[in-house]
């Protein structure tokens, strides 16, 4: 299965008639493995800051998580595994696997819990596969 299929079928899936706004699978180095059409153009330093927060949990809290120029307020996550952010009625979930970052961006009517479930389910599966 291609990485694009994981994005299209597993991240951009339909839940009660709603779906993520955008999603991507990127390498720890910031290289894009696959992304949805609406995924924001991000900078390498934004990915570096996310990776740093996985190594040093809490490092993004003072500045927020930035992706594609959008700032998300960092909310509860799982140190070293998941970072969650909020912006207005939407937000972002980033799950770290051994080789990749699984990123989901949502807006209402999708809920934070639904976004977390979508992103973390794929991330957990990839971890089980050694990725």
Curated annotation (Swiss-Prot):
GO terms for molecular function: actin monomer binding. It is found in: Cytoplasm, Cytoskeleton. Pfam families: Profilin (PF00235). The lineage of its organism: Eukaryota, Viridiplantae, Streptophyta, Embryophyta, Tracheophyta. Occurs in many kinds of cells as a complex with monomeric actin in a 1:1 ratio. Keywords: Actin-binding, Allergen, Cytoplasm, Cytoskeleton. Belongs to the profilin family. The keyword Cytoplasm applies. This is Profilin-5. It comes from the Eukaryota. Binds to actin and affects the structure of the cytoskeleton. At high concentrations, profilin prevents the polymerization of actin, whereas it enhances it at low concentrations. By binding to PIP2, it inhibits the formation of IP3 and DG. The keyword Cytoplasm applies. One of its GO terms (cellular component) is cytoskeleton.
């Amino acid at each position: 299965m291609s990485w694009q299929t994981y994005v299209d079928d597993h991240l951009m899936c339909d839940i009660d008639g709603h779906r993520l706004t955008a999603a991507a699978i990127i390498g720890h180095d910031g290289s894009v493995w696959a992304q949805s059409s609406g995924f924001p153009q991000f900078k390498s330093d934004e990915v570096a800051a996310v990776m740093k927060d996985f190594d040093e949990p809490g490092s993004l809290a003072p500045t927020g998580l930035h992706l594609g120029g959008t700032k998300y307020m960092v909310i509860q996550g799982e140190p070293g595994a998941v970072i969650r952010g909020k912006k207005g009625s939407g937000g972002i979930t980033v799950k770290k696997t051994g080789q990749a970052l699984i990123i989901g961006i949502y807006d209402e009517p999708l809920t934070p819990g639904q976004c977390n479930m979508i992103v973390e389910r794929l991330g957990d599966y990839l971890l089980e596969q050694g990725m």
